[in-house]
Amino acid sequence: MANVNIKPLEDKILVQINEAETTTASGLVIPDSAKEKPQEATVIAVGPGRFDEKGERIPLDIKEDDVVIFSRYGGTEIKFDGVEYLLLSARDILAIVEK
């Protein structure tokens, strides 16, 4: 896991995108023009959760080092210390990949 000095607020999640495969299972190279935008990422940092109507904090089900699948066009791309990250809202996370 990367040691990053970025602490997400509320229900925000900082992830590092897992690069898509560049070859198929049979060994064919996939050209850049045919690659889909990756939707799998590793969680780097998680905010404390948002507050409900009663003022109580709702913690997130996601934790650091989880591998998640996120909405294709969700989040904000950021670059920190030369590394690219994506800052997502909890609602942009579609699933946790269990390995």
From Swiss-Prot:
It is found in: Cytoplasm. GO terms for biological process: chaperone cofactor-dependent protein refolding. InterPro entries: Chaperonin_GroES, Chaperonin_GroES_sf, Chaprnonin_Cpn10_CS, GroES-like_sf. GO terms for cellular component: cytoplasm. It holds the Pfam family Cpn10. Its main location: cytoplasm. SMART domains: Cpn10. GO terms for molecular function: ATP binding; metal ion binding; protein folding chaperone; protein-folding chaperone binding; unfolded protein binding. Transmembrane segments: none annotated. Keywords: Chaperone, Cytoplasm. Belongs to the GroES chaperonin family. Heptamer of 7 subunits arranged in a ring. Interacts with the chaperonin GroEL. Together with the chaperonin GroEL, plays an essential role in assisting protein folding. The GroEL-GroES system forms a nano-cage that allows encapsulation of the non-native substrate proteins and provides a physical environment optimized to promote and accelerate protein folding. GroES binds to the apical surface of the GroEL ring, thereby capping the opening of the GroEL channel. This is Co-chaperonin GroES. It comes from Corynebacterium efficiens (strain DSM 44549 / YS-314 / AJ 12310 / JCM 11189 / NBRC 100395). The lineage of its organism: Bacteria, Bacillati, Actinomycetota, Actinomycetes, Mycobacteriales.
